């Protein structure tokens, strides 16, 4: 089970969207992934994110690489995770 894979649900731990859940849509390279909330559901807009700024969760949805926000919304609804995605997680502060 790879931690960083397409369809993996994650929590943003850094930035203005910290604590919000998102879905990995594409893997750009070993340091960056393309994520989306989608914005209409979680408030996280589609963007590139550093893998150090996301925390993978144990849930995975079935989407294709580069899926649109509408396809991601459908996959979340089919998996019954709509309410789970709306919940905001308090990020864990780790001393540097």
Swiss-Prot record:
GO BP terms, alphabetized: ribosomal large subunit biogenesis; translation
Coiled-coil annotated spans: none
Keyword Ribosomal protein included in the entry's annotation: yes
GO cellular component terms attached to this protein's record: cytosolic large ribosomal subunit
Keywords on record: Ribonucleoprotein, Ribosomal protein
Signal peptide coordinates: none
Family annotation (InterPro entries): KOW (IPR005824), Rib_uL2_dom2 (IPR014722), Ribosomal_eL14 (IPR039660), Ribosomal_eL14_arc (IPR023651), Translation_prot_SH3-like_sf (IPR008991)
Name assigned to this protein: Large ribosomal subunit protein eL14
Organism whose genome encodes this protein: Staphylothermus marinus (strain ATCC 43588 / DSM 3639 / JCM 9404 / F1)
Gene name in the database record: rpl14e
């Amino acid at each position: 089970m790879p931690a960083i894979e397409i369809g993996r649900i994650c929590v943003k731990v850094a930035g203005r969207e910290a604590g919000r859940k998102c879905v990995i849509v594409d893997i750009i390279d070993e340091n960056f992934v393309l994520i989306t909330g989608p914005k209409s559901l979680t408030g996280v807009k589609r963007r590139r994110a550093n893998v150090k700024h996301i925390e993978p969760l144990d849930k995975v949805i079935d989407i294709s690489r580069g899926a649109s926000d509408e396809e991601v919304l459908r996959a979340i609804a089919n998996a019954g995770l709509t309410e789970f995605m709306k919940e905001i997680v308090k990020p864990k502060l780790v001393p540097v």
